[in-house]
């Protein structure tokens, strides 16, 4: 039997998909801008 692939971890989640990571790159800021434009209540993990 293989194990489940999703092993939740808040720290890993924030490091990979967090707000500060998004702000670091131009592409990341574009993602945030798109999500703001769409009206998302949550912008990032």
UniProtKB/Swiss-Prot annotation:
- What GO CC annotations are associated with the protein? ribonucleoprotein complex; ribosome
In its UniProt record, a GO molecular function of this protein is: structural constituent of ribosome
Query: What does the UniProt keyword field contain?
Result: Ribonucleoprotein, Ribosomal protein
Known InterPro entries for this protein? Ribosomal_bL34 (IPR000271), Ribosomal_bL34_CS (IPR020939)
Query: Which processes are annotated in GO (biological process)?
Result: translation
- Which cysteine-cysteine pairs are annotated as disulfide bonds in the entry? none
Q: Which domain of life is it from?
A: Bacteria
Give the signal sequence positions: none
Q: Name one Pfam family in it.
A: Ribosomal_L34
Into which family does the record put it?
A: Belongs to the bacterial ribosomal protein bL34 family.
Q: Which HAMAP family match?
A: Ribosomal_bL34
Q: What protein am I looking at?
A: Large ribosomal subunit protein bL34
Question: Can you name the source organism?
Answer: Arthrobacter sp. (strain FB24)
Per the UniProt record, the lineage of the source organism begins with: Bacteria, Bacillati, Actinomycetota, Actinomycetes, Micrococcales
- Which gene holds the coding sequence for this protein? rpmH
